[in-house]
Amino acid sequence: MPTTQNTVSFHDGRSAPQLGMGVWQVENDIASSVVKTAIDIGYRSIDTAAIYGNETGVGRGIAESGVKREELFIATKLWNDRHGHDSTKAAFAESLEKLGLNYVDLYLIHWPVPKVDLFVQAWESMIQLRDEGSAKSIGVCNFNINHLQKLLDETGVLPVVNQIELHPRFQQAELREFHAEHDIITEAWSPLGRGRLWDEPSLNAIARKHQRSVAQVIIRWHTQLGNMVIPKSVTPSRLKENFHVFDFTLEAQDMADIAALDTPDGRDGPDPELFRLPAA
């Protein structure tokens, strides 16, 4: 299958495929087949996390794919209860073991959990993991500007990626502007808005014009903005559809029409300032 697609460049000198597959809510016992199918289709970037409970299955799919490790881009994430110098390193070692890998291409802090306020300690350990080579690049998820600024002020090191909720109903322009000013790549989770956009008239009009699905239009919007994007599906036909988005281009008016869908209260997931462990 074709694997040609766009890549993004990180400020640490590395690069990544712009389009990947997320495996949130993919059960561990089917993760291997889903990952192998995605790689067969042409995906080279897989995004998992410790809390997903499927790192073992993801690792099995990678091993069974027959694709050389250096051709793949594998990301996983540190969960909220493992922030801290030693606990972060231990959690990372556990993830590597489950994945069956000796390095990951990207290791991410999953949430800042500011009420606990240990994310800087976690970041300091991740800098060490990067310097040792077991995490080739390091990033964060769900960090607001104040969290990113704290990393910069206290460590001098900014993430290469901030993975955030981002879709046409919740476009986070101010945060994306901060990313652009500091050479941080924006990566979108929930990039399709959890299906709430399928009936949106303007998106359907754009889809008809380009003879594409609404999902393909939204994914192409992300890539034309320069975002990394990780849509999730376990259905082979949908995986194929999501992957084939680089052979058409949205026009300026299309991009403007999608920009107009933004709303101030469009968030589907938790607020990073409030999301925390139950006991925190």
Residue ranges and their predicted role:
Residues 5, 35, 55, 59-62, ...:
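Generic structural signal for well-ordered alpha-helices
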Residues 26-29, 47-57, 81-86, 114-117, ...:
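Acidic-and-aromatic substrate-binding clefts and catalytic sites of carbohydrate-active enzymes
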Residues 45, 103-106, 137, 161:
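Residues at the N-termini of beta-strands
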